[in-house]
Amino acid sequence: MITFDHVTYTYEGQTVPSLRDCSFTVGPGELILFTGESGCGKTTIIKLINGLLQHGGGGTLEGAVTVNGRDVAGTPLWELAQTVGSVFQNPKSQFFNLDTTGEVLFGLESRGASQEEMSRALASAAQVCGVGPLLDRNIFALSGGEKQRIACASAWAMGPEVFVLDEPSSNLDGEGIRQLRDILRRLKAAGKTVLVAEHRLWYAADLADRVFYLRGGRLERIYTGAEFLALPEEKRRSMGLRSLTEVPLPEPHPSSETGGLTVRGLRASYGGRAVWQDVSFTAPRGQITAITGHNGAGKTTLARCLCGLMKEQAGTILWGGSLLGRKERRRRAFLIMQDVNLQLFGDSVLAEARLGSTATEQEALAALEQMDLVQYAQAHPLALSGGEKQRLAIVDGCLSGKELLIFDEPTSGLDYAHMLEVSRLLRELAKQGLCVVVITHDGEFLRESGAQTAEWVPKERHQ
């Protein structure tokens, strides 16, 4: 059982609490879905349950959080880890090994499990989490979605009674989300207590026993699963929530437009392994071009080639009909990465928005206001929530002055309202004549943005 007794939490350096007077109880075997707008306190709840904030968060906690009758603040983390398994929004932040098999078994090795026990746990994790083909691989050569599945397998292998998952679907394709749904169903069937913080709701809403809706750090309402699924469309949108049903990806269509970016016969490899070959497509100026595909298809590798961060083995990239070398690509292109933590360098949100840009302070503040970030202008970028960091990186791209903007999963961690704002902003950038390329699994975002899906699927791909 998990209890929150009038819990208020304020992060270090902040004056406004992230969580305010929050009280609830979760019984054994329940699957609870926490949802609400970006920054509403979902991740804070997750980190209070697994003890990360009480044991090193540096903030101020009022009230009490207990798991199985034990006060989390007074229980050592190593003991909590045997009861609570965690899967974070950014799985890289919880990895300790270079290889996938070692990562799945790391917790068991750390507590001195026998070889027989580890073999059984590895086989079970491979079956339940679908990571068999990913074992014995370099963990940093995996796609974002593949890393998320390894994180799920690592938590499963430890056999905890409570599982907390923070935006676990944020980097997954449709098939990966269905696999995640199966994992949640199996956890629930096994009698585990499961708590999921999510914006993407369609895959988990019907599995939830209850849905906790947060707004501005307060637990505003608790719905039964049936009540939540019955919410009218307008009510759901007014709450800032994403679709309760899956929105399929649009079919790809080759573009007949000229100008902008043209890719012909591109081939690339990563770590000595061929990723794809003979990739060709066009991304005209003045429209949003979407690159879709399953996890591990090489979409992020393609983005790195397009902006000159990675060298292709064969093929050509043209801009306005002229050959575009790697140096020129780096001059013209700006990449908003899938893991935005890798590109936030400023010591404040405002400083980050102006870094590498000619924007004035007023222009930067206006861009931050557009992305609902101006209130955090003096905060450190890494103190923001996942969705807020994502929006800040988008501000960086918009102020960069570059002609080719490449967004790798720009709606990861975004609620409905901010997803609409990003859609509107990208449409505006396209209207200005920029070339906008978006890598995404988000069908709802593609529908709202009016993006044209490129027919880029490689003729051959080697796993």
Can you describe what each PLM-predicted range is?
Residues F163-D166, L405-D408:
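Catalytic Walker B motif of ABC-type/P-loop ATPase nucleotide-binding domains
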Residues C152-A153, I394:
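Hydrophobic anchor residue at the start of the ABC signature
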Residues N138-L142, E146, H380-L384, E388:
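Conserved ABC ATPase signature
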Residues E116-L134, E361-Y376:
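Conserved ABC ATPase "signature" region
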Residues G58-R70, G315-R329:
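Conserved ABC transporter NBD signature motif
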Residues E198-H199, T440-H441:
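H-loop/switch region of ABC-family ATPase nucleotide-binding domains
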Residues N50, C307:
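Helix-to-loop junction immediately C-terminal to a conserved catalytic motif
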Residues A155-W156, C398:
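ABC ATPase C-loop
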